[in-house]
Protein backbone atom coordinates (compact mmCIF):
# COMPACT_ATOMS: atom_id res chain seq x y z
CA UNK A 1 0.00 0.00 0.00
CA UNK A 2 1.44 3.35 -1.03
CA UNK A 3 2.57 6.74 0.17
CA UNK A 4 0.20 8.83 -1.93
CA UNK A 5 0.22 12.42 -3.15
CA UNK A 6 -3.37 13.57 -3.76
CA UNK A 7 -3.94 16.40 -6.22
CA UNK A 8 -7.25 18.21 -6.69
CA UNK A 9 -6.76 19.00 -10.37
CA UNK A 10 -9.52 21.58 -10.52
CA UNK A 11 -8.20 23.61 -7.58
CA UNK A 12 -4.61 23.13 -8.75
CA UNK A 13 -5.35 24.49 -12.22
CA UNK A 14 -7.29 27.41 -10.79
CA UNK A 15 -4.22 28.33 -8.73
CA UNK A 16 -2.05 28.20 -11.86
CA UNK A 17 -4.35 30.66 -13.60
CA UNK A 18 -4.17 33.06 -10.64
CA UNK A 19 -0.37 32.94 -10.62
CA UNK A 20 -0.17 33.49 -14.39
CA UNK A 21 -2.55 36.44 -14.19
CA UNK A 22 -0.33 38.01 -11.53
CA UNK A 23 2.98 37.27 -13.26
CA UNK A 24 2.84 37.58 -17.06
CA UNK A 25 5.60 35.91 -19.12
CA UNK A 26 6.17 33.36 -16.37
CA UNK A 27 8.45 30.38 -17.08
CA UNK A 28 7.44 27.30 -15.03
CA UNK A 29 10.32 25.41 -13.40
CA UNK A 30 10.25 21.64 -13.89
CA UNK A 31 13.19 20.02 -12.10
CA UNK A 32 14.40 17.54 -9.51
CA UNK A 33 11.69 15.23 -8.25
CA UNK A 34 9.03 17.38 -9.92
CA UNK A 35 8.13 18.99 -6.57
CA UNK A 36 6.56 15.64 -5.66
CA UNK A 37 4.33 15.49 -8.74
CA UNK A 38 6.96 13.87 -11.06
CA UNK A 39 8.58 15.64 -14.00
CA UNK A 40 6.26 14.32 -16.74
CA UNK A 41 3.15 15.42 -14.86
CA UNK A 42 4.50 18.96 -14.41
CA UNK A 43 5.60 19.18 -18.05
CA UNK A 44 2.11 18.12 -19.13
CA UNK A 45 0.55 20.67 -16.76
CA UNK A 46 2.78 23.37 -18.28
CA UNK A 47 1.70 22.30 -21.77
CA UNK A 48 -1.92 22.81 -20.79
CA UNK A 49 -1.03 26.36 -19.75
CA UNK A 50 0.01 27.19 -23.32
CA UNK A 51 -3.15 29.21 -24.07
CA UNK A 52 -2.30 31.37 -21.03
CA UNK A 53 1.07 32.27 -22.52
CA UNK A 54 3.40 29.51 -21.31
CA UNK A 55 5.74 28.84 -24.25
CA UNK A 56 8.83 27.71 -22.30
CA UNK A 57 9.71 25.69 -19.24
CA UNK A 58 12.94 25.77 -17.23
CA UNK A 59 14.36 22.28 -16.68
CA UNK A 60 17.08 21.39 -14.20
CA UNK A 61 19.48 19.22 -16.19
CA UNK A 62 20.01 17.86 -19.69
CA UNK A 63 18.99 14.41 -18.42
CA UNK A 64 15.74 15.83 -17.06
CA UNK A 65 15.09 17.58 -20.37
CA UNK A 66 15.41 14.25 -22.19
CA UNK A 67 12.76 12.78 -19.88
CA UNK A 68 10.13 15.46 -20.53
CA UNK A 69 10.62 16.18 -24.24
CA UNK A 70 7.55 14.14 -25.12
CA UNK A 71 5.33 15.97 -22.64
CA UNK A 72 6.05 19.60 -23.56
CA UNK A 73 6.19 20.66 -27.24
CA UNK A 74 7.86 24.07 -26.89
CA UNK A 75 11.27 25.34 -25.75
CA UNK A 76 13.04 23.92 -22.72
CA UNK A 77 15.64 26.17 -21.08
CA UNK A 78 18.26 24.39 -18.99
CA UNK A 79 19.06 25.67 -15.50
CA UNK A 80 22.22 23.64 -15.01
CA UNK A 81 25.16 25.33 -16.76
CA UNK A 82 27.17 23.45 -19.35
CA UNK A 83 30.50 22.30 -17.93
CA UNK A 84 33.32 22.08 -20.49
CA UNK A 85 34.68 18.55 -20.53
CA UNK A 86 31.52 16.98 -19.11
CA UNK A 87 29.56 14.28 -20.91
CA UNK A 88 27.52 15.77 -23.75
CA UNK A 89 23.81 14.90 -23.94
CA UNK A 90 22.35 15.13 -27.45
CA UNK A 91 19.08 17.06 -27.40
CA UNK A 92 16.93 18.70 -30.09
CA UNK A 93 17.34 22.35 -31.00
CA UNK A 94 14.35 23.42 -28.92
CA UNK A 95 16.42 22.75 -25.78
CA UNK A 96 18.27 25.97 -24.92
CA UNK A 97 21.62 25.38 -23.21
CA UNK A 98 22.90 27.36 -20.24
CA UNK A 99 26.41 28.81 -20.01
CA UNK A 100 27.91 30.22 -16.81
CA UNK A 101 31.50 30.81 -17.93
CA UNK A 102 33.31 32.33 -20.89
CA UNK A 103 34.81 28.93 -21.74
CA UNK A 104 31.33 27.38 -21.85
CA UNK A 105 30.07 30.19 -24.09
CA UNK A 106 33.02 29.65 -26.42
CA UNK A 107 32.23 25.94 -26.72
CA UNK A 108 28.49 26.54 -27.21
CA UNK A 109 28.91 29.36 -29.74
CA UNK A 110 26.50 28.89 -32.62
CA UNK A 111 24.00 26.97 -30.49
CA UNK A 112 20.94 28.30 -28.73
CA UNK A 113 22.00 29.41 -25.27
CA UNK A 114 21.27 31.64 -22.29
CA UNK A 115 24.05 33.04 -20.12
CA UNK A 116 24.07 33.14 -16.32
CA UNK A 117 25.21 36.41 -14.74
CA UNK A 118 26.91 36.25 -11.35
CA UNK A 119 24.47 37.68 -8.82
CA UNK A 120 24.59 38.39 -5.09
CA UNK A 121 23.73 34.71 -4.68
CA UNK A 122 27.41 34.06 -5.51
CA UNK A 123 26.64 30.66 -6.98
CA UNK A 124 27.58 30.69 -10.65
CA UNK A 125 27.75 32.97 -13.67
CA UNK A 126 30.02 35.28 -15.62
CA UNK A 127 31.38 38.36 -13.86
CA UNK A 128 31.06 41.92 -15.12
CA UNK A 129 34.82 42.04 -15.61
CA UNK A 130 34.48 39.23 -18.18
CA UNK A 131 31.94 40.89 -20.48
CA UNK A 132 34.38 42.00 -23.18
CA UNK A 133 35.82 38.50 -23.29
CA UNK A 134 32.27 37.15 -23.33
CA UNK A 135 31.40 39.23 -26.39
CA UNK A 136 34.41 37.82 -28.20
CA UNK A 137 33.46 34.26 -27.19
CA UNK A 138 30.04 34.67 -28.85
CA UNK A 139 31.85 35.11 -32.20
CA UNK A 140 29.42 37.65 -33.54
CA UNK A 141 26.36 35.71 -32.40
CA UNK A 142 23.93 36.56 -29.65
CA UNK A 143 22.59 34.79 -26.61
CA UNK A 144 18.84 34.26 -26.50
CA UNK A 145 18.84 35.79 -23.06
CA UNK A 146 20.62 36.29 -19.77
CA UNK A 147 19.79 35.05 -16.27
CA UNK A 148 20.09 36.75 -12.89
CA UNK A 149 19.25 34.28 -10.14
CA UNK A 150 18.48 36.25 -6.98
CA UNK A 151 18.40 35.23 -3.29
CA UNK A 152 15.07 34.43 -1.64
CA UNK A 153 15.96 36.41 1.48
CA UNK A 154 17.82 39.71 1.31
CA UNK A 155 19.37 42.23 3.72
CA UNK A 156 17.19 45.22 4.52
CA UNK A 157 19.06 47.55 2.16
CA UNK A 158 19.27 45.12 -0.76
CA UNK A 159 17.60 46.34 -3.95
CA UNK A 160 16.92 43.48 -6.41
CA UNK A 161 15.59 45.86 -9.07
CA UNK A 162 18.86 47.77 -8.98
CA UNK A 163 20.89 44.55 -9.08
CA UNK A 164 19.12 43.38 -12.24
CA UNK A 165 19.25 46.89 -13.73
CA UNK A 166 23.00 47.09 -13.17
CA UNK A 167 23.41 43.89 -15.15
CA UNK A 168 21.30 45.14 -18.07
CA UNK A 169 23.32 48.37 -18.18
CA UNK A 170 26.62 46.47 -18.00
CA UNK A 171 25.66 44.05 -20.77
CA UNK A 172 24.54 46.85 -23.06
CA UNK A 173 27.66 48.88 -22.39
CA UNK A 174 29.69 45.83 -23.45
CA UNK A 175 27.81 45.81 -26.76
CA UNK A 176 25.64 42.80 -25.90
CA UNK A 177 21.94 42.74 -26.78
CA UNK A 178 19.60 41.75 -23.94
CA UNK A 179 16.36 40.60 -25.59
CA UNK A 180 15.31 38.52 -22.57
CA UNK A 181 16.36 38.60 -18.93
CA UNK A 182 15.37 35.59 -16.83
CA UNK A 183 14.96 36.45 -13.15
CA UNK A 184 13.79 34.77 -9.96
CA UNK A 185 12.25 35.71 -6.62
CA UNK A 186 10.87 39.07 -7.75
CA UNK A 187 7.43 40.53 -6.99
CA UNK A 188 5.06 41.85 -9.61
CA UNK A 189 5.83 45.51 -8.73
CA UNK A 190 9.55 44.78 -9.08
CA UNK A 191 9.00 43.17 -12.48
CA UNK A 192 6.86 46.10 -13.60
CA UNK A 193 9.55 48.55 -12.50
CA UNK A 194 12.12 46.71 -14.60
CA UNK A 195 9.77 46.61 -17.59
CA UNK A 196 9.25 50.38 -17.43
CA UNK A 197 12.98 51.01 -17.12
CA UNK A 198 13.94 48.69 -19.99
CA UNK A 199 11.03 48.45 -22.46
CA UNK A 200 13.17 46.68 -25.09
CA UNK A 201 13.99 43.79 -22.73
CA UNK A 202 11.48 41.11 -21.81
CA UNK A 203 11.73 40.10 -18.17
CA UNK A 204 10.66 36.52 -17.53
CA UNK A 205 10.18 35.17 -14.03
CA UNK A 206 11.17 31.55 -13.43
CA UNK A 207 8.85 30.08 -10.82
CA UNK A 208 8.51 26.60 -9.37
CA UNK A 209 7.43 26.40 -5.73
CA UNK A 210 4.83 29.18 -5.84
CA UNK A 211 3.28 27.81 -9.03
CA UNK A 212 3.15 24.11 -8.22
CA UNK A 213 2.88 24.14 -4.40
CA UNK A 214 1.41 27.58 -3.69
CA UNK A 215 -2.13 26.38 -2.92
CA UNK A 216 -1.77 23.77 -0.19
CA UNK A 217 -5.53 23.19 -0.15
CA UNK A 218 -5.20 21.55 -3.59
CA UNK A 219 -2.64 18.95 -2.49
CA UNK A 220 -2.20 16.52 0.35
CA UNK A 221 0.20 13.69 1.15
CA UNK A 222 -1.11 10.59 2.91
CA UNK A 223 0.48 7.40 4.17
CA UNK A 224 -1.37 4.10 4.16
CA UNK A 225 -1.79 2.35 7.51
CA UNK A 226 -0.27 -1.10 7.10
CA UNK A 227 -0.64 -2.53 10.60
CA UNK A 228 -1.73 -1.56 14.12
CA UNK A 229 -0.54 -3.44 17.21
CA UNK A 230 -0.88 -2.78 20.96
CA UNK A 231 2.35 -2.21 22.86
CA UNK A 232 3.02 -2.28 26.60
CA UNK A 233 5.29 0.13 28.41
CA UNK A 234 8.87 -1.16 28.42
CA UNK A 235 8.24 -3.65 25.61
CA UNK A 236 11.09 -3.82 23.09
CA UNK A 237 10.23 -2.77 19.54
CA UNK A 238 11.75 -2.19 16.13
CA UNK A 239 15.11 -2.83 14.51
CA UNK A 240 16.98 -1.24 17.38
CA UNK A 241 14.90 -2.90 20.10
CA UNK A 242 14.35 0.24 22.11
CA UNK A 243 11.77 0.12 24.89
CA UNK A 244 8.35 1.72 24.51
CA UNK A 245 8.14 4.74 26.81
CA UNK A 246 4.41 4.27 27.33
CA UNK A 247 1.73 1.77 26.57
CA UNK A 248 -0.40 2.39 23.52
CA UNK A 249 -0.31 1.47 19.86
CA UNK A 250 2.39 0.93 17.26
CA UNK A 251 1.09 2.05 13.88
CA UNK A 252 3.06 0.95 10.83
CA UNK A 253 2.60 3.28 7.85
CA UNK A 254 3.93 3.43 4.30
CA UNK A 255 6.77 5.89 3.79
CA UNK A 256 10.39 5.56 4.84
CA UNK A 257 13.83 6.91 4.06
CA UNK A 258 13.63 5.78 0.42
CA UNK A 259 10.70 8.18 0.03
CA UNK A 260 12.46 11.00 1.89
CA UNK A 261 10.64 10.53 5.21
CA UNK A 262 12.84 11.58 8.12
CA UNK A 263 15.35 13.36 5.90
CA UNK A 264 15.85 17.02 6.76
CA UNK A 265 17.94 19.77 5.16
CA UNK A 266 19.87 22.28 7.28
CA UNK A 267 17.94 25.44 8.10
CA UNK A 268 18.93 29.05 8.63
CA UNK A 269 17.80 30.14 12.10
CA UNK A 270 17.03 33.81 12.70
CA UNK A 271 15.94 35.20 16.04
CA UNK A 272 15.90 33.89 19.59
CA UNK A 273 12.64 31.91 19.47
CA UNK A 274 13.46 29.76 16.39
CA UNK A 275 16.88 28.98 17.86
CA UNK A 276 15.34 28.05 21.21
CA UNK A 277 12.85 25.73 19.50
CA UNK A 278 15.61 24.06 17.51
CA UNK A 279 17.64 23.53 20.69
CA UNK A 280 14.57 21.95 22.26
CA UNK A 281 14.09 19.63 19.29
CA UNK A 282 17.77 18.71 19.39
CA UNK A 283 17.46 17.84 23.06
CA UNK A 284 14.48 15.60 22.37
CA UNK A 285 16.34 13.87 19.53
CA UNK A 286 19.25 13.22 21.90
CA UNK A 287 16.72 11.39 24.09
CA UNK A 288 15.54 9.38 21.04
CA UNK A 289 12.31 11.33 20.71
CA UNK A 290 11.56 12.64 17.22
CA UNK A 291 8.22 13.96 16.05
CA UNK A 292 7.05 12.23 12.89
CA UNK A 293 5.39 14.00 9.94
CA UNK A 294 2.31 11.77 10.30
CA UNK A 295 -0.92 13.05 11.84
CA UNK A 296 -3.92 11.19 13.16
CA UNK A 297 -7.09 13.03 14.25
CA UNK A 298 -5.38 16.40 13.89
CA UNK A 299 -2.30 15.60 15.96
CA UNK A 300 1.24 14.70 14.92
CA UNK A 301 2.73 11.68 16.65
CA UNK A 302 6.19 10.49 17.66
CA UNK A 303 8.29 8.02 15.73
CA UNK A 304 8.52 4.78 17.71
CA UNK A 305 12.03 4.56 16.22
CA UNK A 306 13.78 6.12 13.21
CA UNK A 307 12.00 5.39 9.92
CA UNK A 308 12.89 2.22 8.06
CA UNK A 309 13.67 2.14 4.36
CA UNK A 310 10.07 1.90 3.12
CA UNK A 311 7.87 2.13 6.23
CA UNK A 312 7.71 4.03 9.51
CA UNK A 313 6.62 2.97 12.99
CA UNK A 314 4.56 5.54 14.88
CA UNK A 315 3.57 5.48 18.56
CA UNK A 316 0.00 6.44 19.53
CA UNK A 317 -1.09 6.79 23.17
CA UNK A 318 -3.41 4.13 24.52
CA UNK A 319 -6.06 6.75 25.27
CA UNK A 320 -6.56 7.38 21.56
CA UNK A 321 -8.49 5.10 19.23
CA UNK A 322 -6.06 3.97 16.52
CA UNK A 323 -6.67 4.02 12.76
CA UNK A 324 -7.55 0.83 10.93
CA UNK A 325 -5.24 -0.94 8.48
CA UNK A 326 -6.01 0.33 5.00
CA UNK A 327 -6.79 3.81 6.28
CA UNK A 328 -4.53 6.81 5.83
CA UNK A 329 -2.61 9.33 7.92
CA UNK A 330 -1.97 12.86 6.69
CA UNK A 331 1.77 13.40 6.15
CA UNK A 332 3.44 16.81 6.40
CA UNK A 333 6.39 16.20 4.07
CA UNK A 334 8.90 18.35 2.24
CA UNK A 335 7.62 17.97 -1.31
CA UNK A 336 10.91 18.82 -3.02
CA UNK A 337 12.60 15.91 -1.23
CA UNK A 338 9.81 13.32 -1.26
CA UNK A 339 9.38 10.53 -3.80
CA UNK A 340 5.81 9.29 -3.62
CA UNK A 341 4.70 5.81 -4.61
CA UNK A 342 1.62 7.23 -6.27
CA UNK A 343 0.26 10.55 -7.48
CA UNK A 344 -3.55 10.37 -7.34
CA UNK A 345 -5.37 13.03 -9.35
CA UNK A 346 -9.04 13.67 -8.71
CA UNK A 347 -11.52 16.22 -10.01
CA UNK A 348 -9.90 15.40 -13.36
CA UNK A 349 -13.25 15.54 -15.15
CA UNK A 350 -15.00 18.82 -14.33
CA UNK A 351 -18.34 17.05 -14.65
CA UNK A 352 -17.43 14.58 -11.90
CA UNK A 353 -17.25 16.11 -8.42
CA UNK A 354 -14.92 14.47 -5.94
CA UNK A 355 -13.28 15.07 -2.61
CA UNK A 356 -10.56 13.57 -0.49
CA UNK A 357 -11.60 10.50 1.49
CA UNK A 358 -12.19 10.98 5.19
CA UNK A 359 -8.97 10.36 7.11
CA UNK A 360 -8.84 6.81 8.33
CA UNK A 361 -11.51 5.47 6.01
CA UNK A 362 -10.22 2.02 5.11
CA UNK A 363 -9.61 1.64 1.42
CA UNK A 364 -11.43 4.87 0.48
CA UNK A 365 -10.26 6.72 -2.63
CA UNK A 366 -11.63 9.82 -4.34
CA UNK A 367 -14.01 9.34 -7.22
CA UNK A 368 -12.61 10.04 -10.68
CA UNK A 369 -9.12 9.33 -9.35
CA UNK A 370 -6.33 8.95 -11.89
CA UNK A 371 -3.12 7.38 -10.59
CA UNK A 372 0.41 8.02 -11.74
CA UNK A 373 3.43 6.11 -10.47
CA UNK A 374 6.31 8.22 -9.21
CA UNK A 375 8.63 6.19 -11.38
CA UNK A 376 7.05 7.43 -14.60
Regions from the PLM with identified roles:
Residues 5-8, 28, 162-376:
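Active-site anion/phosphate-binding pocket segments in diverse small-molecule metabolic enzymes
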Residues 3-14, 24-177:
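Active-site-proximal beta-alpha core segment in soluble small-molecule metabolic enzymes
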Amino acid sequence: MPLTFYVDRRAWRAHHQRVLADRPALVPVVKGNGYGFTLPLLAEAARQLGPAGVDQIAVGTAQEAARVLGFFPHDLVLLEPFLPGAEWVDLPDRVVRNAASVDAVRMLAGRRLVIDCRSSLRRQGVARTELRELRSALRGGEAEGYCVHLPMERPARADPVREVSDWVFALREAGLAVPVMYVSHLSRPELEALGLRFPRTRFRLRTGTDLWLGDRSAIEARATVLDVRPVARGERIGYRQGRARRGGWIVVVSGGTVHGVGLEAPKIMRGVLPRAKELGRSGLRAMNRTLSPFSWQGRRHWFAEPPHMSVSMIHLPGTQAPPRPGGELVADLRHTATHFDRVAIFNEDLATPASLPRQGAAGARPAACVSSSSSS
